[in-house]
Amino acid sequence: MKIGITNDHRGVKKKQLLTIFLTDLGYTINNYGTDTEDSVDFPDYAYKLGRAIQNNEVDLGIAICGTGIGMSIVLNKMKGVYCAKVANVSEAILSKSHNDANVIAISEEMDDFTTKEVIVKFIETPFSNVDRYVLRNEKIKDIENA
């Protein structure tokens, strides 16, 4: 599985941690973020990951900034990109099992243990295919295409 990771200047260390962690688990990582802690504009880096999702360059995405909120706002403006701003394991699981999210946005302030747990649960959780969630996600796509 290919996973894209993007980040702004505040997420460099967290990206480095996750790149090593996920590579050790056997995932292929594509880097769409900055590698420097010099101030950058997060929309530029969110957009790079969003385009990678749209072009099927990666299967899933991880976006890291100060809070995760800015990245999630940008990513959710992009057709076919469904980003969940997640703060805990439960939200990571539900973002996939109910909402079929293909990108997760996290805060660089999340502790490393929780970060690893959240990311693994996001990657490993399948969409449930329960009728009500399928219908709700179809409605989201209808709104997206309106």
What residue ranges belong to the model's regions?
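Glycine-rich phosphate/diphosphate-binding loop of Rossmann-like nucleotide-binding domains
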Residues: M1, I5-D24
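Short active-site oxyanion
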Residues: K2-I3, E57-G61, G80-Y82
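Short, conserved beta-strand edge motifs with alternating hydrophobic and charged residues
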Residues: T6, N30-Y32, G61-C65
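C-terminal binding/interaction regions
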Residues: T6, R10-K13, V89-A146
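Short helix-loop-beta junction
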Residues: F21-I29, G80
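A short beta-strand-loop structural module common to alpha/beta enzyme folds
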Residues: T28-S39
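Short, structured active-site "lid" loops
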Residues: Y45-A63, T67
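Mid-chain, well-packed structural core segment of small domains
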Residues: I64, I69-E108
